[in-house]
């Protein structure tokens, strides 16, 4: 399996070993567009791998901060209480760049930028950029994807 993320269409394709689309999901990438620099709040481009899978066994809508469950379960009431919070929910696929000087090492290191594929509240619109760099997915879609991929799975992000 391999993941291909197309920024213009805001779609994530899970490809089988022949390169055929096995699953297609709507996503939300960065509101600032694409870019490699740390602090840009952009979605990085290029070849990546899934560095780590985080959150297996946690309930749907589990809230994560710094890749750790907080003990909170997201609800619309919690969202209203913290309207400016960037919600990372349910599962995390932590990405690592594979291209030194482009998306790996130094000020362009995807992993050190903490770029994830992660779940988000149901109120977040998919198909429209809006994150601060990560790839947001519907929780149910992410649960499915999480079970279909392994750490080390290739992820290509293109504009």
Name every feature range the model reports, one short phrase each:
Residues 1, 26-40, 72-79:
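N-terminal post-signal-peptidase region of extra-cytosolic proteins
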Residues 24-26, 47, 114, 154:
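Well-ordered beta-strand positions in beta-sheet-rich domains
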Residues 35-36, 58-61:
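Short, solvent-exposed loop/turn elements at domain surfaces
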Residues 60-159:
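Exported/periplasmic cell-wall-interacting domains
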Residues 7-9, 22, 45, 88-90, ...:
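Extracytoplasmic
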Residues 35-53:
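Short, surface-exposed secondary-structure junctions/capping segments
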Residues 4, 13, 49, 92-94, ...:
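Soluble periplasmic/extracytoplasmic beta-strand elements of cell-envelope proteins
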Residues 1-33:
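A structural motif detector for short, solvent-exposed N-terminal "entry" segments of globular domains
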């Amino acid at each position: 399996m391999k993941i291909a993320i197309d920024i213009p269409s805001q779609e994530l394709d899970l490809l089988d070993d022949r390169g055929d689309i096995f699953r297609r999901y709507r996503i939300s990438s960065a509101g600032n567009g694409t870019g490699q620099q740390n602090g840009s709040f952009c979605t990085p481009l290029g070849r990546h791998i899934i560095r780590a899978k985080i959150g297996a066994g946690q309930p749907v809508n589990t809230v994560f901060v710094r890749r750790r469950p907080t003990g909170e379960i997201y609800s619309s009431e919690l969202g209203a209480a913290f309207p400016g919070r960037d919600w990372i929910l349910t599962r995390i696929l932590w990405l690592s760049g594979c291209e030194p000087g482009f998306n790996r090492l130094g000020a362009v290191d995807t992993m050190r930028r903490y770029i994830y594929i992660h779940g988000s509240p149901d109120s977040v619109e998919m198909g429209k950029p809006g994150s601060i760099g990560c790839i947001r997915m519907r929780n149910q879609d992410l649960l499915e994807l999480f079970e279909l991929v392994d750490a080390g799975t290739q992820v290509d992000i293109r504009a």
